């Protein structure tokens, strides 16, 4: 990996070692990314890999070092890991808070979600908006869960399947409440695709 460019060897290594456990608890998962015991407002989940090593560096460069070109590598990884999706699926980014958009100069997950939608020739819709500017990076699990409940709002959406795209799954609070607001707004079903899963030993305060 040089700068924000992911070489083929690194890319293939991430894909070959893709995340295969339950996105919520890490135990062996059934077909769609959740074990039989875990319940979530999303029906299916996919994850590229654990947030470590090269994948962690790629995400950090994209989020914190303005390495906008890393978007292309992340779209490639999502495209490689996710199976074929039905034509009617709509791709929705988990929105970034406005202060971070101003700081970076772009909404990092909106770019990824739009790029993935274009790659798969699927519809893209920025259906969810941030209702608050709370920053979750570095907060405790309890704080994340409390903040996430008031984090999002969404206008009415047509019935259908919506795929939420986010960068990191830590406690799951963000995508759970984002999925909740989509369902309340009219979505028939919500699926999620995340670039990385925070290692379980570090989920409390990251």
Question: For the regions a protein language model found, what residue spans apply to each?
Answer:
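Glycine-rich phosphate/pyrophosphate-handling loop used in enzymes and phosphotransfer proteins
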Residues: 1-206
């Amino acid at each position: 990996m040089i700068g924000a460019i992911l070489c083929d060897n690194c890319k293939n290594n991430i894909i070959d070692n893709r995340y295969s456990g339950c996105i919520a608890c890490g135990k062996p998962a059934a077909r769609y990314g959740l074990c039989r015991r875990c319940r979530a407002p999303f029906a299916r989940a996919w994850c590229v890999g654990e947030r470590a090593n090269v994948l962690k560096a790629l995400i950090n460069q994209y989020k914190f070092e303005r390495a906008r070109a890393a978007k292309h590598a992340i779209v490639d990884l999502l495209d490689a890991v996710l199976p074929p999706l039905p034509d009617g699926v709509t791709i929705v980014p988990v929105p970034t808070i406005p202060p971070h958009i101003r700081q970076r100069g772009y909404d990092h997950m909106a770019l990824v979600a739009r790029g993935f939608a274009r790659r798969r020739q699927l519809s893209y819709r920025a259906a969810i908006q941030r209702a608050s500017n709370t920053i979750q990076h570095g907060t405790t699990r309890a704080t994340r869960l409390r903040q996430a409940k008031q984090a999002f709002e969404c206008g009415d959406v047509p019935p259908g399947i919506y795929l939420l795209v986010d960068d990191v799954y830590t406690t799951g609070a963000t995508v759970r409440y984002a999925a909740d607001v989509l369902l309340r707004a009219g979505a028939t079903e919500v699926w999620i695709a995340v670039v990385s899963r925070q290692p379980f030993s570090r989920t409390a305060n990251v």
